From Swiss-Prot:
It comes from Francisella philomiragia subsp. philomiragia (strain ATCC 25017 / CCUG 19701 / FSC 153 / O#319-036). NCBIfam families: L21 (TIGR00061). This is Large ribosomal subunit protein bL21. Belongs to the bacterial ribosomal protein bL21 family. Keywords: Ribonucleoprotein, Ribosomal protein, RNA-binding, rRNA-binding. This protein binds to 23S rRNA in the presence of protein L20. It holds the Pfam family Ribosomal_L21p.
Length: 104
């Protein structure tokens, strides 16, 4: 059983019991979160439900387990033959959610 949810402009494939890193949102650790924008899902019996654009009545419930920052991404701009370069770094915030139930 799995579902494809939309959060923060991105799509994620989630399964029950799985921990997923999503875009940061302001909730404390241990708080419940619900996702109503389920784009597609498969039931335990193997039936696939495809939304147009979302599956009506479908819901994914999870619990926040961690708030943090990802590894640093380095951006390097290099100008050839000019002996010039520019280095920049970025660390994206994330919220880790453990999926507790999927209802389609």
């Amino acid at each position: 059983m799995y579902a494809i949810i939309k959060n923060g402009g991105k799509q994620y494939k989630v399964k029950e019991g799985e921990v997923v890193k999503l875009e940061k949102f302001d909730l404390g650790i241990g708080e419940k979160v619900e996702f109503d924008t389920v784009l597609m899902g498969q039931t335990a019996e193997g039936e696939v439900k495809i939304g147009a654009p979302i599956v009506e009545g479908a819901k994914v419930v999870g619990e926040v387990v961690e708030q943090g920052r990802n590894k640093k991404v380095k951006i390097m701009k290099f100008r050839r033959r000019k002996h010039s370069m520019k280095q920049q770094g970025h660390r994206q915030y994330f919220t880790a959610v453990k999926v507790s139930s999927i209802s389609l």
